[in-house]
């Protein structure tokens, strides 16, 4: 994951110091892109240990269309707890927008089902898009979508995906985001009988929090390890039928975990 370390170096060298919503302060750049060939390994950061179990459960939670943290808590995943209300609700965040985007007529659009059907029937379409950025519901969300918009692309029998992330916590959040969307691309490719292409990550306000600088320096002192392999052990009938045990990560030999505070 040299690309990830290069981004950190770029922010430190070229970034500007900015204030932010959380009051923590950041060093930030605007507009950055990374590309990962998914046929060459699974893009999981190795210069610190990443919690793949949380990444998988969060993605399955999104795909269920759920917006209450009960499922996550049942599976010992606490990454959304800081934003949940007393009942565990987050408002109409990612899962709601992916699976039940509300229309003016009172209906709902299942964007995930829709985009998979489009990939199968119209692979050359330039409208293979899923958006979580619903302007009409932002004020109801506990946290506005950071990874806001993604697009699929089919060429030469391979599926690629590009994510636009309007705001990115590079130290804590980005390793999760890259792995999550790489895994989603693998799942969609399997459902559509396509080979793996690239995952392209595009960042808007791409930042390191001021209280992550020591952790960033430690991570930059470490050598990245070879990419691990992610295997999907079965092909269920639907994108919504995957279970945690369907995924097997092998040859992941990361450096030790690095703890850092979350900016809420």
Curated annotation (Swiss-Prot):
Question: GO molecular function, one example?
Answer: thymidylate synthase activity
Q: Which positions does UniProt annotate for dUMP binding?
A: 21, 126-127, 166-169, 177, 207-209
Q: Give GO BP annotations, semicolon-separated.
A: dTMP biosynthetic process; dTTP biosynthetic process; methylation
Protein name per UniProt: Thymidylate synthase
Per the entry, what this protein does is: Catalyzes the reductive methylation of 2'-deoxyuridine-5'-monophosphate (dUMP) to 2'-deoxythymidine-5'-monophosphate (dTMP) while utilizing 5,10-methylenetetrahydrofolate (mTHF) as the methyl donor and reductant in the reaction, yielding dihydrofolate (DHF) as a by-product. This enzymatic reaction provides an intracellular de novo source of dTMP, an essential precursor for DNA biosynthesis.
Main subcellular location of this protein, as a coarse class = cytoplasm
Associated pathway? Pyrimidine metabolism; dTTP biosynthesis
Q: How does it assemble?
A: Homodimer.
Q: Which residues form a coiled coil?
A: none
Record-linked PROSITE patterns: THYMIDYLATE_SYNTHASE
One short Pfam family name for this protein?
Answer: Thymidylat_synt
Instruction: Give the source species.
Output: Shewanella baltica (strain OS223)
Enzyme class, broadest EC rank = transferase
* EC numbers: 2.1.1.45
Report the subcellular localization.
Answer: Cytoplasm
* SUPFAM superfamilies associated with the record: Thymidylate synthase/dCMP hydroxymethylase
Similarity remark: Belongs to the thymidylate synthase family. Bacterial-type ThyA subfamily.
Q: Which InterPro entries does the record associate with it? A: Thymidate_synth/dCMP_Mease, Thymidate_synth/dCMP_Mease_dom, Thymidate_synth/dCMP_Mease_sf, Thymidylate_synthase, Thymidylate_synthase_AS
Q: Which PANTHER family match?
A: THYMIDYLATE SYNTHASE, THYMIDYLATE SYNTHASE 1
Q: Which UniProt keywords apply?
A: Cytoplasm, Methyltransferase, Nucleotide biosynthesis, Transferase
* Classification via HAMAP family: Thymidy_synth_bact
């Amino acid at each position: 994951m040299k690309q990830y370390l290069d981004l950190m170096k770029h922010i430190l060298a070229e970034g500007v110091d900015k204030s932010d919503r959380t009051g923590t302060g950041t060093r930030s750049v605007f507009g950055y892109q990374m590309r990962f060939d998914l046929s060459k390994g699974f893009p999981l950061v190795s210069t610190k240990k990443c919690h793949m179990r949380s990444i998988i459960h969060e993605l399955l939670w999104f795909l269920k269309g759920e917006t209450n943290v009960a499922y996550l808590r049942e599976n010992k995943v606490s990454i959304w707890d800081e934003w949940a209300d007393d009942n565990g609700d987050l408002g109409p965040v990612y899962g709601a927008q992916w699976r039940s985007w509300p229309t003016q007529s009172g209906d709902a659009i299942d964007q995930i089902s829709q985009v998979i059907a489009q990939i199968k029937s119209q692979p050359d379409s330039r409208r293979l898009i899923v958006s979580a950025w619903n302007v009409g519901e932002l004020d109801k969300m506990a946290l506005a979508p950071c990874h806001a918009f993604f697009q699929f692309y089919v060429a030469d029998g391979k599926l690629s995906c590009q994510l636009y992330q309007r705001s990115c916590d590079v130290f804590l959040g980005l390793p999760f985001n890259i792995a999550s969307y790489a895994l989603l691309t693998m799942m969609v490719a399997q459902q559509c009988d396509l080979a793996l292409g690239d995952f392209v990550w595009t960042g808007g306000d791409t930042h390191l929090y001021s209280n992550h600088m020591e952790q960033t320096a430690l991570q930059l002192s470490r050598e990245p390890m070879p990419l691990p392999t992610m295997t999907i052990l079965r092909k269920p009938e639907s994108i919504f039928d995957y279970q945690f045990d369907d995924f097997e990560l092998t040859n992941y030999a990361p450096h030790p975990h690095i703890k850092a505070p979350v900016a809420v």
